[in-house]
Amino acid sequence: MKDTVGALVPGTSVHVDGAADGPLSGLTFVAKDLFDVAGHPTGGGNPDWPGNQAPAKENAWAVQTLLDGGATLVGKTITDEVSLGILGENVFHGTPVNSAAPDRVPGGSSAGSAAAVAAGLCDI
């Protein structure tokens, strides 16, 4: 996927197909980099964390629920470091672009997720 707004965590590639027959089948979603995705490290907005911990053994409840519903996970998104911010600015990964107002920050610790949806990178 081409990330035109800097919403996805750099250097990551995450794709997990959802259940084929769920009510969300055909929809895509991204997960904030605070949610565990089985087989992938959870960085929490800090580039050093993934190298110092094992990949997640299972999906976070929210991620698994969306997958069980049929949605397909297509990436992990930037967050303020350890989700401690209100602007969506990450000194390590950069600030995602606010498609609706490029001269303004996307805002909130879920800025990467919001930027991804606004830019059409995913549905949810």
What are the language-model segments listed below?
Residues 1-124:
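Gly/Ser-rich catalytic/binding loops embedded in alpha/beta enzyme cores
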